[in-house]
């Protein structure tokens, strides 16, 4: 068995902190004995090309040994027009080539044209940060317009929703309209206390039964007349036939009990 494979090894899922972390404990930070942070990097390489933060993003032409024809790089429009007019030296070169191809001025004119195009290309590169800032500005303005439109739509939807909720709240908490009056077919009129009248008739019937021993015919006649009068009183409100029949049936049952 290979050494080290027999015993169980504990492996941390995270790497150990760097050694300089021990110099920045809470106690040392509170006491002020912690070392100062390292200085930020001012020089670095990207894809093999060196960059320095103190220098301009685009190095001047003098660092490359090229003569700079423009003076003010901030006024790039005017400088670009000057360089564009300087391309007229190309016609001088053509004239030299036509008249004296071996004249030493030929090389000078070719160098001038080469330098002019390098200056134009460099001036365009100087304008790249300005172009980038304008592109970001235009992008942000478009995003602001889109967000403003979205916020306006949300406000419109919110106002519409509030109107709907307020209308529903008024319908719930407001005073409800009175119910419509019942029709003639469903109207029930129990005038003069019909139920109370039935109870009184039943009591009168019980009293008549007690007085039956004295006079059998008279109570029967008076009770029958009283029941008919009660029926007329209860049905004079023109109630539904079902209610009238129910009351008449109860009175008939009371008559049969006698």
Swiss-Prot record:
**Its biological function?**
Component of the Mediator complex, a coactivator involved in the regulated transcription of nearly all RNA polymerase II-dependent genes. Mediator functions as a bridge to convey information from gene-specific regulatory proteins to the basal RNA polymerase II transcription machinery. Mediator is recruited to promoters by direct interactions with regulatory proteins and serves as a scaffold for the assembly of a functional preinitiation complex with RNA polymerase II and the general transcription factors.
Question: What lineage is this protein's organism placed in?
Answer: Eukaryota, Metazoa, Ecdysozoa, Nematoda, Chromadorea
Region Disordered: start-end pairs: 1-39, 202-243
Family per similarity comment: Belongs to the Mediator complex subunit 7 family.
The coding gene here is: let-49
Alphabetically, the GO molecular function entries are:
transcription coregulator activity
Biased composition of type Acidic residues is found at 203-217
Q: Which GO terms describe its biological process?
A: embryo development ending in birth or egg hatching; regulation of transcription by RNA polymerase II
Please verify whether the record's keywords include Nucleus.
yes
Broad class of the protein's primary localization:
nucleus
Intracellular or extracellular location(s): Nucleus
Q: How would you summarize the oligomeric state and partners of this protein?
A: Component of the Mediator complex.
Query: For this UniProt entry, what's an example GO CC term?
Result: mediator complex
Q: What's the name of the protein? A: Mediator of RNA polymerase II transcription subunit 7
InterPro entries xrefs: Med7/Med21-like (IPR037212), Mediatior_Med7 (IPR009244), Mediatior_Med7_sf (IPR044888)
Q: Where in the sequence does UniProt note compositional bias of the Polar residues kind?
A: 220-229
Keywords from the named record: Activator, Nucleus, Transcription, Transcription regulation
Pfam families of this UniProt entry?
Med7
Highest rank taxon of the organism: Eukaryota
